[in-house]
A protein has these predicted regions:
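Generic detector of contiguous secondary-structure segments
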Residues: 95-107
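HotDog/MaoC-like acyl-thioester-processing domains
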Residues: 1-23, 107-112, 116-166
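Short, charged beta-turn/beta-strand-edge "cap" motif at the junction between a beta-strand
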Residues: 34-36, 102, 119-123
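Hot-dog-fold acyl-thioester-processing enzymes
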Residues: 2-98, 149, 160-166
Length: 166
């Protein structure tokens, strides 16, 4: 099959939810979980120049009362944020920011993170009729259902009948 034949048969699928799906109070239980391993933590910590020994030196972490190495909190945040993308913002629209980020409990190498988000507000964009502005409250949990991180994030979210280009 030639490339042009292949392209002519391709079907474009819409990804993610749209603004009309974002009703205040709606809760998304994000279906993926992610176990954080030592390599994830070490790579993230060194690649972001975050050289706090709590994140890569077990004897140091233990000297401060921790059982083992802590996971870098920014990796926790980014992982939980990432778990929410498929449901909340994969459909397209610029990221507008994060507010009220709280790291609630420590996360350790080997912990599995899950996420849940609730629509806090949704309103039409005054400047771009193809989008709405949505804010969610996202919570991250460990494998024991203990909340470890919480934040609000805001995105422009494409309307169902909007043009495909941003």
């Amino acid at each position: 099959m030639s490339e042009s034949d292949f392209r002519s048969q391709a079907v474009t699928l819409r990804k993610g939810n749209r603004f009309e799906d974002m009703i205040a109070g709606r809760v998304f239980e994000h279906h993926w979980g992610r176990t954080i391993n030592a390599g994830d933590n070490s790579a993230f910590t060194t690649q972001t120049l975050s050289f706090c020994p709590l994140y890569f030196n077990e004897p140091y972490a233990q000297s401060l009362g921790h059982e083992k190495i802590l996971v870098n909190p920014m990796l926790v945040f980014n992982t939980v944020f990432g778990l929410s993308v498929e449901d909340l913002s994969e459909g397209g629209g610029p990221f507008l920011g994060v507010d009220q980020c709280q790291f609630i409990e420590d996360v350790y190498v080997g912990d599995t993170l899950t996420a849940r988000s609730e629509v806090i507000s949704a309103r039409a964009s005054k400047g771009n009729p193809d989008f709405g502005i949505v804010t969610w409250h996202t919570q991250g949990f460990n494998q024991h259902s203990v909340q470890v991180v919480s934040f609000q994030r805001t995105n422009l979210v494409r309307r169902r009948n909007a043009a495909q280009q941003i």
